[in-house]
Amino acid sequence: MGGLSAMQRRIDLLVEGGDEYDACSHFRSVVMWDKSLRPPLPRAEPRIRVLHDDVTVDRYGWLRDRENPDVRAYLEAENSYAEQATAHLRRLKTELIAEIEGRQPCEGATPPFQVGPFDYFQGHERGLPHPVWWRRPVTGGSAELVLDPNAIPGADVFYWLGVFEPSDDGRYLAFSVDLIGAERYELRVRDMSDGRDVWRDAGSVGQVVWAADNHTLFFTRERPDRRQHHQIVRLNVGRGNSEVVFEEANERLAVLVRRSQSGAWLFLDVLTTSDMSSYVQRGAAEVWCLPADEPGGQWRRIVMRELGHQIYAEHWYDRFLFRVDDAGPYWRLVSAPIDDPSPSRWEEVVPHRAGVTIDEIHVLEQHLVLLEREGLRPRLISRNRSGRVGAVIVPDEPSCTIRVGLSAGGCYSAARHPFRSSKLTYSVSSFVTPDTFIEHDFANDRSVVLCEARVPGYDATQYLATVVMAEAEDGVQVPISLVARRDRTSPGPVLLSVYGCYGIPRLPSFLAWPSSMTARLSLLDREVAFGIVHVRGGGELGRPWHDAATRDQKRITHTDLISATEGLIERGFATRDGVVIEGKSGGGGTVLATAVFRPNLFRAVVAEVPLADIIDTQLDSTMPYTLKETAEYGDPQDAYEYRYLRSYDPYYNLSPERSLPPTYVDAALDDGQVIYYQPARYVAQRRSCATDRDPDLVFRIRMVGGHSGPSHGPGIAEQAAFRMAWVLDQLRSHAPPPSRKARSAARRSTDPVR
């Protein structure tokens, strides 16, 4: 009884507004550039939760009701405050927007890709928000319009492409669009002979694949409450009828449908929702197959989920290829006869090698090509049908990204390459190398550059990229990919980016406009270096790198970031008061949590659509990604894991006694991954827990668009310019870019880390 009485007194104190509550509830005036500005603070509606004898109060849970007019009023007030608080940066923001928009590459930044008798390609007419899709016969002739997103009602506000999949004969086009930003894609099938849309599926659709008959389409449909695909639907376009042919009942599993690179087989993968290690070729717990020319047939299970392995299947001649993790986390490659691919018939093709991850399998008629990664360096290795190693392609970059094949670029579009060929197209991209598309002929081991993104005004020789190592608390070496101008003065300001979640590898990439590096050139030109810290929890160094920082080891992600920052300062690359950390989504949660542990180490924090409250996400059964988050962070229903989460959860570590660095937070009203009220609650609670330090806190919420941000140029440039102007202001780096000032040759260096 005594314990209950004490707990009740704590609850009464929190609800009634005793001393503890008063300390957190007073609204403060942020000392920014205009001291008369006062940020908004929504009303508090305290709700008590008692879990594992821990009493917490959620004062701003009511913000989740987006239909409440007070919610929108508060969000609009935050946007207004953000504009006023950064009013002194308007000229800088305008300058940055002009720089970013001026780097839009010329046409032809991506080569066309072939499907059947046609080459498909994009054309971007200036003045229109979205590129238009065309096609031209492979044999030559005039181009014809296939898809103009600018003509879709609502696309002028927001438009995101999900899939773009033409049938092999060129009759039909399956494409999907998101016109809100919530990542729920509507499927449409267009008859390209007359331009009519002959089918629509308003449900949330993912992958699509055509059967060999060119009128049967298979696609995945999403489970509404879990945001994962659980159904495979077969559509007969000619008849206009559809039926569910496979449904996964286990909500911890999802399904995916695809076609083998040979074109002969369809594969149905059953995936664990917690496995996000690769967006391109994810391992499956179970695999089914169906001949592509028998779309009405019965699917055959070739990998049993009872095996407990992760497997990716491909087809090559009379055998199936399996990338499997049975021998270790870096994968090995085996083959098996099509009629009996059971494990007893597996024959090893490539053994498991510690430290060498087999990321992807690609097959040509006479060549097997593997995309491997050792450390941060990817490579392509070919083998002929007898298993002899042929070409080995290793880009001359310290760390970079290789993408194999060509696709339409939609989030569910599959990259493709011709099977009956000895040539394979791939792209290389890094901090200093814009996307460069290369065709390699494995018959004669020769390469030719097809095209490269030409960024106006960009001179790659002015920048230098490198990789340095930092020693973590436990002695592990953590890599940091860095880029800076060659003539940058060291030490200097640095923007460090981090993700560190779900085993997703984040490697340097330039990407074509509009993208992060084309925008970040404006930072580099103002002598702010940029880097990615490859902390544990990510997948850059393979699955063990991820597994080392999950659940009750998750704080290793944060301590790795701290060690990397300290290492750059000790090496004389970064100034002690000149490091800004940034992260997006799960990475946003990473930087917010890390700032709790070492607030004085960082000049400022940028948290885009951050996972700011892990505990409440896990406890809310209506949240779409709860199961995935549990596998990564732990289950707060377990007392031990709850206490561990409580030790670093950004929201629950806000207090009046803790000062935090200046922070920029953004969110999106229609975000389907990190629901807007997570960042909003964090900001409101942090404002209410102001300390004497009064750290500057800016919060912007996009009323249009979702997790990935605006969908076309002006919005993307404005968002990037606002964020970078804020970062430059925190670093006091208002210096103009080098085109407007003389640079001393005496400052030139060959190594950005001295």
UniProtKB/Swiss-Prot annotation:
GO function term, MF aspect, one: serine-type endopeptidase activity
Active-site residue numbers: S585, H707
Keywords from the named record: Hydrolase, Plasmid, Protease, Serine protease
Top-level division of the source organism's lineage: Bacteria
Chain residue ranges for the region called Disordered: 733-754
InterPro entries, alphabetized: AB_hydrolase_fold, Pept_S9A_N, Peptidase_S9_cat, Peptidase_S9A, Serine_Peptidase_S9A
One GO term of the biological process aspect: proteolysis
Enzyme nomenclature, EC number: 3.4.21.-
Gene3D superfamilies xref list: alpha/beta hydrolase, Prolyl oligopeptidase, N-terminal domain
Family listed: Belongs to the peptidase S9A family.
Name assigned to this protein: Uncharacterized peptidase y4qF
Species assigned in the record: Sinorhizobium fredii (strain NBRC 101917 / NGR234)
